[in-house]
UniProtKB/Swiss-Prot annotation:
This is Ribosome maturation factor RimM. One of its GO terms (cellular component) is ribosome. One of its GO terms (biological process) is ribosomal small subunit biogenesis. Its main location: cytoplasm. The keyword rRNA processing applies. Binds ribosomal protein uS19. The gene is rimM. InterPro entries: PRC_barrel-like_sf (IPR011033), PRC_RimM (IPR056792), RimM (IPR011961), RimM_N (IPR002676), RimM_N_sf (IPR036976), Transl_B-barrel_sf (IPR009000). Residues 90-163 form the PRC barrel domain. Pfam families: PRC_RimM, RimM. An accessory protein needed during the final step in the assembly of 30S ribosomal subunit, possibly for assembly of the head region. Essential for efficient processing of 16S rRNA. May be needed both before and after RbfA during the maturation of 16S rRNA. It has affinity for free ribosomal 30S subunits but not for 70S ribosomes. It is found in: Cytoplasm. Belongs to the RimM family. It comes from Oenococcus oeni (strain ATCC BAA-331 / PSU-1).
Amino acid sequence: MKELRIGRVINTHGIAGELKIDFNTDFPEQRFAKNSELLIAGEKLVVQSSRPFKQFWLVKFSDHENINLVEKYKGEDIFINERKEPRLSEGEFLVSQIIGLKVIDEKGNSIGEIADSFHTGANDVWTIKKSNGKEILIPYIDQVVKKVDLQTSTVTIELLEGLDED
């Protein structure tokens, strides 16, 4: 069964076994809900509790009552089984579906491909790796991202002034 990456453990939080997670999912409330099963470092863990914290989520797992039991997860990616994907409406997509998509401008010129996505307080930001190896960051907002086409594996953007320094 395929696994989807939904975040990374950034650090521990306090001494009671909570982990600070940088999430990479549009559904953190569902992904980190009580009794959800997550995979970290090859281990299946069950969420005991979770809560938003600044731009992160704090998650505590069953049978992991103190910091000593969770320190080993620092820096580890967090996965779910693909079968647990939520149903999406027309025009919606998962972050995992856009990684690797070709990025073009409105004239069809190639810009690069999506290498990563991360959440900020205001909106998501996509990292685009250009053919010359440089990376640019674009906000996922209507003024920039014009079309996401999963069928053709392309994203059309309007590259506003200042987004690409080349």
